[in-house]
Each structure stands twice: as C-alpha cells, then as structure tokens.
Design a protein with these regions (language model features):
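Charged catalytic and DNA/RNA-contacting regions of genome-maintenance
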Residues: 1-206
Length: 206
C-alpha cells in the first residue's frame, strides 16, 4: 500500500559544484505498478476511480501496463461485488465521498483526491483532449456522467504519477451493467476463484 518516488539525474556531474540535480521521473503506487518483475502473474495491477451518488456509481479502471481503460455505471448495492470482481490494487475517490463498505475492501489502497478532480464536465474535456476527439460518443460513453467523472479523475492521477501523457491509452471501453454474471463477495470467496479461503494465491480455479 506504499508509494515510491523514483528520481533520475538531470544535472551534469562534470559541471555541478554540489549535489547533482535530480527530478521526479514517476511515482509508483499500488495501482500504477508496471514493472513486469514486480507484477503478480495471476492478477493485474489495476487502478480504479469511483464517483457517484446514492442512486448511481460510476467506475473507471485502468491497466497502466497494457493501456486497457474501462468504465461502467452500477447501482450502489452492486458496488462491493463489482470491486471484488475487478480486484483493483488501488481506488481513487473524492475527499468528500463516503465509503460505507470500506471494511470490505481489505488490502485495497484508498487514495483521496480533491473533489474538483471528479467534475464530469472538466473530465469530459480532459478525456476528449487525450483521445483527440470532439466528444465521447464514439466510445458509447454519452450521458455516463458519474463514469466520465471517475475516468477523468483516474486519467489525471495516472498522468500525474507517471509525469507524462499516456499515448498507449487509446480507447475508452464501456461495460454495461448486466454484461457479466454477478456474484456476491461471499460466493466468490467460497468458490475460491482467485484466492483460497485463507487468502492464499493457490490452489484456486484461476
């Protein structure tokens, strides 16, 4: 659950009279880990963002290593099970967002960001600028305000931690509610799909 700041030397040792100047090249967090040697073979290091109200939640999640970027909107009662299915390493939420299901998140890192990072209109503009499109209709994301808000906050955070644009993130994929068979948290754990009842990585079904 820790973050690591990676710095690179930018100054010239030959001309520097004191310590050589260094600059932050990237910040590695649980959800932005891309080093193959450190990744779990059975689990992607996914970064997720949540935004929404008591009626509807918007989710966005990104595999920074592959560039796979997805969004969805679901009812609050399905949120915990959906997070269990996706299994992100880190979740970004607004400072003012309450998480009543927080005890169920286990070891997932929760990162708070300013509320204004989740403004849906600003998020739509940032996403359009990133994808170089006039709108998000080509991705089927029109009208998904909570999901767009989450996606914008996620993209901003990912770019900030990597200190660069993310050209390999080239599309926004919309997952509609009902696309997947929903299993509650208890059922998923009892089936030992991805970890045993004792929390071990093996033996499991996947």
């Amino acid at each position: 659950g820790e973050s690591v700041v990676i710095c690179e030397q930018v100054g010239d040792p030959a001309t520097s009279k004191g310590p050589v100047e260094r600059a932050v090249s990237r910040i590695v967090t649980p959800g932005t880990l891309t080093d193959a040697a450190l990744l779990d073979d059975k689990r992607d290091a996914l970064l997720m963002a949540l935004s929404g109200t008591r009626q509807q939640f918007g989710l966005a999640w990104l595999n920074l290593a592959s560039g796979d970027f997805r969004v969805s909107e679901i009812a609050p009662e399905k949120l915990a099970a959906t997070i269990e299915r996706i299994r992100p390493a880190e979740i970004i939420v607004a400072e003012g967002l309450e998480l009543p299901f927080a005890p169920e998140l286990g070891s997932i890192t929760i990162t708070r960001q300013p509320d204004w990072h989740f403004d849906s209109e600003a998020a739509a503009r940032e996403l359009c600028a990133h994808f170089k499109t006039a709108s998000l209709s080509g991705f089927g994301a029109d009208g998904l305000r909570p999901a767009i808000a989450a996606a914008g906050a996620l993209l901003r955070y990912a770019q900030a931690t990597q200190t660069r644009a993310l050209p390999h993130v080239q599309a926004l994929n919309v997952e509609r509610d009902g696309t997947f068979l929903g299993l509650d948290t208890a059922t998923r754990r009892n089936l030992e799909l991805t970890e045993t009842l004792r929390g071990q990585p093996a033996p499991t079904l996947f």
